[in-house]
Amino acid sequence: MKYDLTITPTPEKAEVSVTMREDHGADIYDITITSDEPVTGVKLSFHIPAGDIAGRWFPRMKMFDKGVHNSWEGATWTNFTGGAPLVSFYRSDDRNRLTAALSDCKAAWALNIGVDDRTKCLEFIAETKKVSISSESNKYTLSLFIDASTEGTSPDGSKLCDMTTMGARNERYWWESVRAASDFMASFCPSHRLPDFAFDPVFSSWYSFQRGIFADKVLEQCGMAYDLGCRTLILDDGWQTTPGVEDYSCAGDWTPNRDKFPDMKGFVDKVHAIGMRAMIWIGPGLCGDASKLSKLYGDKKIPGGWVLDPRFPEVRARMTEDVCRAAEKYGFDGLKIDFLDSFQGGDVRPENADGRDYLSLTDAVDDMARLISRRLSEISPDFLIEYRQNYTGPAIMANANMIRVGDCPQDYLTNRVGSIDLRLHTHAAVHSDMVQFNPDEPVEVSALQMVNILFCTPQVSVMFDQISEEQRQMLKFWLGFMSEKRELLQKSELMPHRCDANYSYVTARNDEEELHAMYSERLLMLDKPRKRVYIVNGVDRKPLYVGSNEKLTAHCRILDCTGREVKNETITIDCSPARVDVPMCGMAVIDLVI
């Protein structure tokens, strides 16, 4: 083997067989563990030389700590509803140093990954004490993805990995390796149908109204949202609550509050008449103490929690009916399914099952999610299902076609990092957290919320009649541009440079066009540019500089953050970078002269 791979099964007497193959541009180790008694866990590890490591990427929300870390300082956990067993270490030149991933995305993995200061090696240690098997089995299979960049030796001089036959793929960028690892993990899971309208801009009621939503008020905002470019409404939390209730004490009673929505079916019909699809928020499993649901199922909650225990078959049936009623009775086109990461707790033993037909909480949540997805797909094969960070792994995402950045109101940095992270390791339509801003702030400051989410589907949650006319024009421009250029921005090659600097500039390109979003960098050197180049100034009011190793002549239009043209000129781009005065949150549109 190319790597000093150690595998320790539970039970320890189990037999382990390993075969290696190349796929997804990496080394894949297929591991089979067999035993005379049930296989319950496994620990595996390998190491490579710890040279040229600039930082670490990991698919969990708000992972601003890009440090390399020590392998002994504590585990990072992933499970079915939290992240994915995937990690990447990148070099100072944005190239991949090591990317590793596991095929089992249901198991709870403890990942100890980092530098061992004693051996000066980069260690990967993954352990699960409960493999994801619904019923105990004497056989367990697991595949390990390894993509490392250089040949090296350990301190005692022995060779750690033989990379001499791996060729040019060792020089790919870290994000290319992460995407390959994501494809590898997804190959073990079914995929969900993904309609193009899952990428349509969204108006969400949450930040606009909180729980104080009423049918007529939402419809007023929908009309304005449609005029600005939104094509989907998400009716968020509050449609089911009594006015004035600001907590989850009544959560679980998923019927419309008649003071707010006296005719929910009629409301959905009016949203459709405006020209928008309608989605509705729901948190399956939530069971507040003051809810009617608690009186029926209060003894079937997860111990110590505020959610129902889906290991009871009647609980799964009730949650499925509650969720599907919104589509079947009211005509909604999609669901925003929240709080799936609240199903946390230990497994139970057979003698303590007490009517549960699953011992594993993970398997019960998986069964419930698959049942809901299947029922909704029977209603419409293109039914929209939105999940949220952190339940983003390929196993659970097999049941959804939209994934949203976790809540980060007015935090455009988290929205930028979160949306890029989701683009790299999921295969659904990635949505931003809802954009909101202060109606009294300068329009270019408000526009920071938009230009930082260019590479995902925008969700907006403002009161459109309470913002300035300039802010409305800004939204109309960027929503229109992002919708028109979705093939470039969301479905083409994505290059998020400088992960250690929270993606200081990001590039998307296809055969005809490319876009560069400059978030910290001021100098852009074009390399074999496409016919049209967009450059977005996401920094401040200072100028940008554009250069190239070959002499280029181009027409350059400068737009401000509302889309208004402020300059139109012919420029020369060469090894002496040209100054391009792009306003804050504006854009340069450069057409090369052939």
Regions found by a protein language model. Name each.
Residues 1-185, 189, 415, 548, ...:
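N-terminal accessory beta-strand-rich subdomains and adjacent acidic, glycine-rich linkers
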Residues 147, 152, 156, 368-584:
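Active-site-proximal substrate-binding groove within the catalytic cores of carbohydrate-active enzymes
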Residues 173-190, 232-237, 259-304, 382-386, ...:
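Glycine-rich, aromatic-flanked loop segments that form ligand/cofactor-binding clefts
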Residues 199-205, 233-235, 278-282, 335-337, ...:
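Hydrophobic faces of well-ordered beta-strands that scaffold small-molecule active sites
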Residues 198-200, 207-211, 269, 277-330, ...:
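Active-site-adjacent "subsite" loops/lids of carbohydrate-active enzymes
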Residues 206-207, 228, 236-261, 280-307, ...:
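Aromatic-lined carbohydrate-binding surfaces of glycoside hydrolases
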Residues 217-241, 329-333:
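Catalytic domains of carbohydrate-active enzymes, especially glycoside hydrolases
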Residues 200-216, 248-262, 302-320, 350-365:
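The substrate-binding groove and active-site-proximal loops of carbohydrate-active enzymes
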